[in-house]
């Protein structure tokens, strides 16, 4: 009968799974998975090692799962991460708060995406028979986020600030991003040999995509490098830079009112901000793309600098 066939199949699958490694709970498994990523046993889709940013995202997901398990007084295992878990986990995140407020849909979506990644590897390697992550309802949330950019006048205000060295370094590293479109992680990796003054370009292989790009050196960029003996400015951590950027933009007078529609805790609301409070390291990349586009530089040329492979992804950067 169909039941006999199903039971026999489950018995055989169970025997196969029993030969695989077992884990005390989901946290032991995630540690195992992250260590495999760090050692290069698990690679990304391009066949290269996962970036530090991806590892940090995995650790953040692990922390969210631990908070959930503690709040619900439950033990999480590979087998328990079912569709019922998914529904309750999303409900918990929509009701919970963290150090910066309520969880946004894209943050929840990132957690779910990472959980699906963990479960897929476990399923494919016979660490679990749980396949609920494949179900359509186990979906990743995604929201089109309203973001800002700094126009050329605002960049000039920032450029003209008289600052002590430690603050000037933060400002200048940010402006390098505004004038190149490089991600903050790549700005931190910039070395003098990447900067070809004789050719007027920066050539670097990006960390996230492993693509080699060439970016023109504009006059403003050249003058910034000159402040550091024709070397890139030093960078601080992403978190420290984001905190300082808000202060520097306020000092520069970048304080116009910005109204954003946001989803927080599952509720849509309109919130008012001063523009300086919305500036992050990623604002630099959006500012580069948007200002170049508004200056009628062809999208294909801007994409060659930013490393975007599709115009649809690129246009999400335009404000």
Map each language-model feature to its residues.
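Conserved tyrosine-mediated DNA breakage-rejoining catalytic core shared by Y-recombinases
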Residues: 180, 189-224
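N-terminal core-binding DNA-recognition domain of tyrosine recombinases/integrases
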Residues: 34-53, 62-146, 160-161
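Short, basic (Lys/Arg/His-rich) helix/loop patches that form interaction surfaces
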Residues: 230-235, 246-304
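Basic, Lys/Arg- and aromatic-enriched nucleic-acid-binding interface segment
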Residues: 105, 109-111, 128-184, 188, ...
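DNA/chromatin major-groove-contacting recognition/catalytic segments
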Residues: 214-227, 304, 316-319
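N-terminal helical hairpins
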Residues: 1-54
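A short, basic/aromatic helix-end/turn motif that makes direct DNA contacts
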Residues: 189-195, 293-295, 303-309, 318-319
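Catalytic-site neighborhood detector that most strongly recognizes the C-terminal catalytic loop/helix
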Residues: 149, 206-210, 306-319
